[in-house]
């Protein structure tokens, strides 16, 4: 049974790879004509900021279609669980890929990827705010005539359906690597994390002090009491992006 599952996982992974890499093509007019706001709205992602791999969380709160390729984005960033900054900007669609074969199973639904670039400016206190820029990919699936976010519930695939790779530039001009995703953070050093048998990544001790301690305590630290674990999980599961502040805020 395990061998069958492994073979199934490998086949699905290859299909995803084939979909994302081999079939990239020019934007399709029928897809671009639709409102793709739903692909970006309410996304929660996690990533790294800087060479020390400080934890950054990103949540997109509002999306509005400007034209066939451009969408206005509003969202909130949180660095090391403490500095929260609202941001606004845009994503631009550059190309669309379609899978050679539609992938649908109990755990996965994917018809292709949308690729593009983004620019988000944090606003508020110049001591903390900056600008995010880079490239993104977003998985999609067709639901009748509607386009919806792709779906993947198999952690073992280590597959990102939402992925942003780029940099963050401070108001003073300091530039840092900054990438985030829904599953596996891109652009991390080889020693950033280890994967367990379930396909979950666990940040290595070297980087934990940079905002990752609570995540480790919530799901992977076996030396804590039930109450301590519960407290850590509440922090991870809270809707931290619901704030009224129009500027950067320190927790």
Positions of PLM-derived features:
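Short, exposed beta-strand/loop patches in secreted or surface proteins that constitute
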Residues: 60-66, 91
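Charged, amphipathic alpha-helical segments
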Residues: 52-59, 93-104, 125-153
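Short beta-strand elements
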Residues: 179-191
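Bacterial Sec-dependent N-terminal signal peptides
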Residues: 1-28
């Amino acid at each position: 049974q395990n061998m069958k599952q492994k073979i199934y996982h490998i086949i699905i992974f290859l299909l995803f790879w084939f979909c994302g890499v081999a079939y990239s093509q020019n934007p399709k007019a029928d897809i671009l004509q639709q409102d793709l706001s739903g692909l970006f709205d309410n996304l929660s992602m996690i990533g790294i900021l800087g060479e020390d791999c400080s934890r950054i969380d990103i949540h997109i709160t509002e999306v509005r279609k400007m034209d066939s390729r451009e969408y206005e984005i509003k969202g909130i960033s949180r660095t090391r669980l403490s500095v929260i900054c609202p941001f606004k900007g845009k994503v631009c669609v550059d190309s669309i890929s379609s899978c050679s074969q539609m992938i649908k199973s109990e755990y996965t639904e994917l018809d292709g990827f949308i690729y593009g670039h983004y620019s988000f400016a944090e606003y508020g206190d110049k001591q903390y705010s900056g600008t995010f820029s880079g490239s993104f990919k977003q998985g999609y699936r067709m639901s009748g005539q509607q386009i919806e976010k792709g779906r993947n519930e198999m952690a073992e695939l280590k597959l990102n359906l939402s992925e942003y790779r780029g940099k963050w530039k401070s108001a003073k001009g300091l530039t840092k690597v900054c990438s985030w995703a829904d599953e596996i953070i891109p652009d991390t050093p080889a020693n950033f994390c280890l994967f367990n048998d379930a396909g979950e990544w666990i940040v290595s001790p070297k980087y934990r002090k940079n905002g990752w301690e609570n995540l480790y305590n919530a799901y992977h630290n076996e030396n804590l009491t039930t109450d301590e674990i519960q407290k850590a999980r509440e922090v991870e599961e809270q809707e931290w992006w619901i704030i009224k502040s129009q500027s950067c805020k320190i927790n």
